[in-house]
Amino acid sequence: MTFHSYGQPGRPRLLLIHGLGVTHEIFLPLIGLLKGEYDITAVGIDGFLLGEKSRYTSIDDQAGQIIAYVQEHFDGHLDVAYGLSLGGKILSRVLERDEIVIDHAILDAAPLLPLPRWSVDPLRYYQSFNVWTCYHCTGFWKWLLHSHYFCAMLDECKKAWPSGKGKAVRDGYKDVYTNKLESIHGADIQFWHGTKEGFVARPQARHLLALCPEAHIEVFPGMNHGQLLMDRPDEVAARICKMTEND
């Protein structure tokens, strides 16, 4: 795992955790908007490190590395943590372990529930193929296989593939969808998702509310998986700023 620092030391502390098949650079537009006001750390998940060979380990291992880093560098306290997809799953594990204090936690389309076991292997190989084609395909084949993707996401997948390749995608996917969030701790926990991923996201939101009735669910019209961060980083930045303006 790698930790990339941006912004202003001494300002409110913001931790960013990316998703499966992309790198920490997916956050660069958001970082550009917030670096004047926050002490920002963008995490690189093992298996998806930019320019570095690595292998995915486990949700618990990644969460443990984050906890250790925050304890060492930030006295065990973050003002805001934002996790996207796999990053949200890792963040939920950090909150479950309850070893550091996070004032505001954003789980953006985090998969908190396991899938039926029979479905995990076919889907993880399908997801691995998806990311492989992001890296290798151009022209007609790119259009045919990825008409449902937005271009910025394709570019991010290309960056991540060389690090852990298909094994990292398959191992990460299996780990995400065979683990269930059993408990969660935090003063302000938010779950975000877009309407275009509602079929998958709504059960996760219901599960979170069953564990933490005080959690806040935010639904973004017209947005797909990861699209709010990539298409509207200004809105994400504004919401983060609003969280900390009265702290």
Enumerate the language-model features and the residues they cover.
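Conserved HGGG/HGGXW glycine-rich cap/lid loop of the alpha/beta-hydrolase fold
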Residues: 4-52
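Catalytic histidine-centered segment of alpha/beta-hydrolase-like enzymes
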Residues: 223-233
